[in-house]
A protein has these predicted regions:
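C-terminal/domain-terminus segments
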Residues: 229-234, 240-246, 445-467
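Hydrophobic helical h-region of N-terminal Sec-dependent signal peptides
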Residues: 9-11
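Bacterial Sec-type N-terminal signal peptides, specifically the leucine/valine-rich hydrophobic h-region
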Residues: 15-16
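Bacterial N-terminal signal peptides that target proteins for export
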Residues: 1-6
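Structured, solvent-exposed acidic/aromatic patches
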Residues: 35-38, 69-392, 419-426, 432
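Membrane-proximal, proline-rich intrinsically disordered regions
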Residues: 19-75, 79-82, 333-338, 453-522
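Surface-exposed intrinsically disordered loops and tails
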Residues: 185-188, 310-325, 393-420, 462-478
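Active-site/pore-lining binding-face segments in mid-to-C-terminal subdomains
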Residues: 378-463
């Protein structure tokens, strides 16, 4: 009998051991089960820059940066959307999922370990996510986000989202200014692929974000241009501060999303509108030297763009049809140098000095300080020319450098940069800002166009803010004749699983994407 009990005991112990071994199958003996706080950072910085490029395939068509010619007019070129699709919602996915609990864990660890610099960067990333999402989608989920006890979520107002961005940025600045605790440049640098652990540059980045946020209030009585200018002055001081992500180009996931090898834009073409801003049509016949360094010529060597209202290439011959952004007619040129940002190794920005100087110029102009506005505007245009040259050297692309003589002649043209501050116009500021943000600053560019209702006019000159821009005449049927103002929330998380939350904000309406944003209203 004792032998039976002994055998049973041995059997139970063996079963327990086997069960434990089975439960251990998800433990990798060759990899850590937990990671240090700084190792959460690299993929989030990657998506911070790359996600807007994903959604840029769609935002760029609302704003007529690019068009997608085909045998019928494209949905997004008509300011519509793709039903039952996640198109246009990469940022939504990446902020709530790729950042999601990872960002929560990183910030909790950083705070517990008194790594105030890493905590500050985390707060910037959190603010960045809210800013990008609310500018794309309007009302978003903030208070209940990443709550693992919930299965459905309530939306928050855009006003609240904007206030939360400001709060997070102010907290981030305070934390990044701290030198106590376990603040450590080398530790932060291990995961910081943007600024290599430089707290000073992250502080400047936070002020830049604050400037962008505050400037979006331009249509409201609470708009304070002096606060916008003050934030810009504490942000980037030159192109050396630009927030750039370098792509190693070792495999598909770390190749620039706009790059030739990934081929995401081989069927896209530049529009008549953007060509018109640069070929002399919009600005007194002055040809922009950036035209031949940013845009693609047709096979006959001329620069043309397509009209989103015209099916395909219209009446253009094969020699007249503009090449794709890589500089090729179709799929040719794989792994060959591209053009400007459309190259495998081209660095993509999250924010630039030029962009922020345009923000300062607009704020100063609105405040009536035309001298400050002109100085900032000139800095903005000049620094973007330098930016174009730098990006075309990232991988020795096939565009020549803009010479000092070309740059000087362009900046000396009164149609581009007036000598008299009183002659500066909003048309110049906003159109040149459009060029400077072309194909990377999608969300800010679209916010600008919505703030000016796409076809708004300069109150001083009566001229269009964006000369040559016309909304499509054949708008998407669900629009009801209205232009687009937001992208619908992500289909597979919201329209499938969170319909009650959407219903509360009117998100189930077929024309929800045409509802103006709170921030653009008086």
């Amino acid at each position: 009998m004792k032998k039976r009990y002994l055998a049973l005991a041995v059997g139970v112990l063996s079963l327990t051991s086997a069960c434990q071994d089975f439960l251990d199958v998800n433990e990798n003996p060759n990899a850590p089960q937990t990671v240090t706080a700084n190792l959460y950072l690299p993929p989030m910085i990657h998506w911070m820059v790359t996600s807007p490029a994903f959604d840029g395939r769609f935002v760029s068509r609302y704003t007529q940066q690019l068009t997608l010619p085909g045998t019928v007019l494209s949905t997004w070129d008509r300011m519509g959307y793709d039903p039952s699709s996640d198109n246009g919602a990469q940022m939504w996915r990446d902020y709530y999922w790729s950042f999601g609990q990872n960002l929560v864990d990183m910030m909790n660890k950083a705070e517990a370990e008194e790594r105030w610099d890493l905590l500050g960067v985390g707060q910037i990333l959190k603010a960045w996510g809210w800013q990008q999402l609310t500018d794309l989608h309007g009302e978003i989920i903030v208070k209940e986000a990443i709550d693992q006890t919930k299965f459905t979520f309530n939306y928050d107002s855009q006003e609240y989202a904007y206030q939360e961005v400001q709060r997070l940025l102010n907290e981030a600045i305070k934390n990044l200014q701290r030198t106590d605790g376990a603040v450590d440049q080398a530790y932060l640098a291990r995961g910081d692929k943007m600024y290599n652990g430089d707290r000073t540059k992250w502080i400047k980045f936070a002020y830049g974000m604050l400037a962008l946020n505050l400037n979006h209030y331009s249509n409201k009585s609470t708009y304070k241009p002096a606060e916008v200018i003050a934030a810009v002055d504490k942000s980037f001081s030159s192109n050396a501060d630009d927030a750039l992500l370098t792509y190693p180009n070792t495999n598909n996931d770390d190749i620039n999303f706009l790059g030739r090898t990934r081929g995401n834009f081989q069927n896209y073409r530049q529009t008549q509108f953007v060509v018109g801003l640069m070929n002399g049509t919009a600005f007194g016949g002055v040809v922009d030297p950036r035209l031949s360094r940013m845009l693609s010529p047709s096979p006959d060597g001329q620069y043309r763009g397509l009209d989103p209202d015209v099916v395909g290439f219209g009446a253009l011959t094969a020699q007249q049809q503009p090449n794709n952004p890589y500089g090729y007619a179709g799929t040719g040129g794989l792994q060959l140098p591209g053009r400007y940002l459309f190259d495998d190794k081209a660095k993509l920005p999250a924010m630039t000095y030029s962009q922020l100087q345009f923000v300062k110029a607009e704020a100063a102009y609105r405040a009536g300080d035309k001298a400050t506005a002109l100085a900032a505007y000139r800095n903005a245009v000049s620094s973007h020319i330098d930016f174009v040259n730098a990006r075309n050297l990232d991988n020795n692309q096939n565009a020549t450098q803009i010479t000092a003589a070309e740059k000087a002649a362009f900046l000396a043209s009164p149609a581009i940069v007036p000598t008299d501050p009183g002659q500066l116009t909003l048309t110049q500021i906003m159109s040149q800002k459009y060029i400077a943000q072309w194909m990377w600053g999608h969300n800010e560019l679209w916010m600008d166009m919505r703030r000016y209702n796409y076809t708004g006019v300069d109150p001083v000159t009566g001229q269009p803010i964006y000369p040559g821009f016309e909304p499509p005449t054949n708008l998407y049927p669900d629009n009801g004749g209205k232009v687009v103002h937001r992208i619908r929330p992500r289909y597979n998380s919201e329209y499938v699983w969170n319909r009650a939350g959407l219903d509360a904000i009117g998100g189930l309406a077929l024309d929800y994407h045409t509802k103006p944003l709170w921030i653009t209203q008086p």
